From Swiss-Prot:
This is Prokaryotic ubiquitin-like protein Pup. The lineage of its organism: Bacteria, Bacillati, Actinomycetota, Actinomycetes, Mycobacteriales. Is modified by deamidation of its C-terminal glutamine to glutamate by the deamidase Dop, a prerequisite to the subsequent pupylation process. Residues 1-35 are annotated as: Disordered. Pfam families: Pup.
Length: 64
């Protein structure tokens, strides 16, 4: 029953999903870029204030 549902749903949705996925994918990439830019700006601000402390917080100690 699951196989039949997958075939039917997949066959009917392929044509409809392709344009939607392309549009959704472009929107997702823009959101990810915005989030990445915000994160990089935050890191830059931290590095300007105290680079040594920032680096120490990410250094692994004792092989962990």
């Amino acid at each position: 029953m699951a196989q039949g549902g997958q075939v039917s749903a997949g066959g009917g949705r392929r044509d409809d999903d392709e344009p939607i996925e392309q549009t959704s994918g472009a929107g997702t990439q823009q959101v990810n870029v915005t989030g990445t830019d915000d994160l990089l700006d935050e890191i830059d601000g931290l590095l300007e204030n105290n680079a040594e402390e920032f680096v120490r917080s990410y250094v692994q100690k004792g092989g962990q």
